[in-house]
Amino acid sequence: MAVERTLSIIKPDAVAKNVIGKIYTRFEDAGLKIIASKMVQLSQADAEGFYAVHKERPFFNDLVKFMISGPVVVQVLEGENAVLKHRELMGATDPKKAEPGTIRADFADSIDANAVHGSDSLENAAVEIAYFFAQSNIYSR
């Protein structure tokens, strides 16, 4: 099995609920190491740049507005099959469809305020990680 890295964002709704530690515990209990982390308040330009791939989608403006509504916690996770493992921990995008015990089932309110973001592929993970972190600020352990 390959050791991978993936980007994870704890979104404004989950930060406001003060469940950062509970989400971190789930990452670590699943064998994912947090190798970089920071809390940031995204600007409109930051959010638009990060989600540029969705620019033509009908939900783009609402997504950007939501992501700048409060601070987020951005982290790099590392571990065996990190991309898939993180996506399984998150659960379905719509929390109503998420399996019980997943982050979104337990902490998300709606398809928009869905607690977490996670890279959907290794290729996107590399791009997303570089968007938020210089290589010199990532510490494998």
From Swiss-Prot:
GO terms for biological process: CTP biosynthetic process; GTP biosynthetic process; UTP biosynthetic process. Keywords: ATP-binding, Cytoplasm, Kinase, Magnesium, Metal-binding, Nucleotide metabolism, Nucleotide-binding, Phosphoprotein, Transferase. Its EC number is 2.7.4.6. The keyword Ribosomal protein does not apply. The active site is at 117 (pros-phosphohistidine intermediate). It holds the Pfam family NDK. ATP binds at residues 11, 59, 87, 93, 104, 114. It comes from the Bacteria. It is found in: Cytoplasm. PROSITE patterns: NDPK (PS00469), NDPK_LIKE (PS51374). Gene3D superfamilies: Nucleoside diphosphate kinase-like domain. Signal peptide: none annotated. One of its GO terms (molecular function) is ATP binding. It catalyses: a 2'-deoxyribonucleoside 5'-diphosphate + ATP = a 2'-deoxyribonucleoside 5'-triphosphate + ADP; a ribonucleoside 5'-diphosphate + ATP = a ribonucleoside 5'-triphosphate + ADP. The keyword Transferase applies. GO terms for cellular component: cytoplasm. Its cofactor is Mg(2+). Belongs to the NDK family. Major role in the synthesis of nucleoside triphosphates other than ATP. The ATP gamma phosphate is transferred to the NDP beta phosphate via a ping-pong mechanism, using a phosphorylated active-site intermediate. Homotetramer. This is Nucleoside diphosphate kinase. It comes from Methylobacillus flagellatus (strain ATCC 51484 / DSM 6875 / VKM B-1610 / KT). The gene is ndk.
